[in-house]
Amino acid sequence: MHAALITVTIDPGKEDEARAMLDAQVVPMVRQAAGFVAAYWLEPHDGKALSIAVFDSEENAKAGAPPAGMRPPGSPVFVESVEFHNVMANA
Protein backbone atom coordinates (compact mmCIF):
# COMPACT_ATOMS: atom_id res chain seq x y z
CA MET A 1 0.00 0.00 0.00
CA HIS A 2 1.04 3.58 -0.63
CA ALA A 3 -0.15 6.79 1.00
CA ALA A 4 -0.40 10.31 -0.32
CA LEU A 5 0.24 12.91 2.38
CA ILE A 6 -1.35 16.15 1.20
CA THR A 7 -0.94 19.59 2.78
CA VAL A 8 -3.33 22.37 1.79
CA THR A 9 -3.83 26.02 2.67
CA ILE A 10 -7.38 27.32 3.08
CA ASP A 11 -8.13 30.95 2.29
CA PRO A 12 -8.90 32.92 5.49
CA GLY A 13 -12.62 33.07 6.24
CA LYS A 14 -13.38 30.34 3.69
CA GLU A 15 -13.24 27.34 6.03
CA ASP A 16 -16.98 26.59 5.76
CA GLU A 17 -16.83 26.77 1.96
CA ALA A 18 -13.81 24.45 1.95
CA ARG A 19 -15.61 21.96 4.22
CA ALA A 20 -18.71 21.96 2.00
CA MET A 21 -16.53 21.33 -1.05
CA LEU A 22 -14.72 18.52 0.76
CA ASP A 23 -17.99 16.79 1.66
CA ALA A 24 -19.76 17.32 -1.67
CA GLN A 25 -16.92 16.85 -4.16
CA VAL A 26 -13.56 15.70 -2.82
CA VAL A 27 -14.59 12.77 -0.61
CA PRO A 28 -16.85 11.15 -3.25
CA MET A 29 -14.18 11.63 -5.95
CA VAL A 30 -11.39 10.09 -3.87
CA ARG A 31 -13.63 7.23 -2.75
CA GLN A 32 -14.13 6.28 -6.42
CA ALA A 33 -10.43 6.47 -7.37
CA ALA A 34 -8.72 3.32 -8.61
CA GLY A 35 -7.12 1.32 -5.82
CA PHE A 36 -8.66 3.44 -3.04
CA VAL A 37 -8.24 1.89 0.43
CA ALA A 38 -8.95 4.67 2.97
CA ALA A 39 -8.59 8.41 3.45
CA TYR A 40 -8.56 10.83 6.35
CA TRP A 41 -8.92 14.59 6.28
CA LEU A 42 -7.66 16.36 9.39
CA GLU A 43 -9.26 19.49 10.80
CA PRO A 44 -7.52 22.69 9.67
CA HIS A 45 -5.21 24.49 12.07
CA ASP A 46 -4.00 28.04 11.38
CA GLY A 47 -5.24 27.85 7.78
CA LYS A 48 -3.45 24.58 6.99
CA ALA A 49 -4.93 21.11 6.73
CA LEU A 50 -3.54 17.64 6.13
CA SER A 51 -5.02 14.61 4.50
CA ILE A 52 -3.80 11.07 4.11
CA ALA A 53 -5.15 8.94 1.29
CA VAL A 54 -4.13 5.29 1.09
CA PHE A 55 -4.16 3.30 -2.14
CA ASP A 56 -3.26 -0.26 -3.10
CA SER A 57 -0.24 0.79 -5.18
CA GLU A 58 2.14 3.68 -5.73
CA GLU A 59 0.78 4.10 -9.24
CA ASN A 60 -2.78 4.50 -7.98
CA ALA A 61 -1.68 6.84 -5.17
CA LYS A 62 0.01 9.12 -7.70
CA ALA A 63 -2.99 8.98 -10.02
CA GLY A 64 -5.48 9.65 -7.20
CA ALA A 65 -3.72 12.56 -5.50
CA PRO A 66 -3.92 16.19 -6.63
CA PRO A 67 -0.74 17.79 -7.94
CA ALA A 68 1.18 20.15 -5.68
CA GLY A 69 0.62 23.80 -6.60
CA MET A 70 -2.96 23.17 -7.70
CA ARG A 71 -5.93 25.38 -6.91
CA PRO A 72 -9.16 24.00 -8.39
CA PRO A 73 -11.16 26.71 -10.21
CA GLY A 74 -13.20 28.71 -7.72
CA SER A 75 -11.77 26.79 -4.78
CA PRO A 76 -10.66 28.30 -1.47
CA VAL A 77 -8.05 25.55 -1.17
CA PHE A 78 -4.46 25.57 -2.47
CA VAL A 79 -2.52 22.29 -2.56
CA GLU A 80 0.82 23.15 -0.95
CA SER A 81 2.53 19.78 -1.15
CA VAL A 82 1.99 16.12 -1.93
CA GLU A 83 4.29 13.38 -0.69
CA PHE A 84 4.09 9.66 -1.40
CA HIS A 85 5.10 7.05 1.16
CA ASN A 86 5.07 3.28 1.34
CA VAL A 87 2.79 2.15 4.17
CA MET A 88 4.94 0.11 6.55
CA ALA A 89 2.19 -0.98 8.95
CA ASN A 90 -1.42 -0.31 9.82
CA ALA A 91 -3.78 -1.24 12.63
Per-region residue spans from a language model:
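Short S/T/G/P-rich N-terminal loop/turn motif that feeds into the first structured element of a domain
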Residues: M1-L50, D56-A68, P76-A91
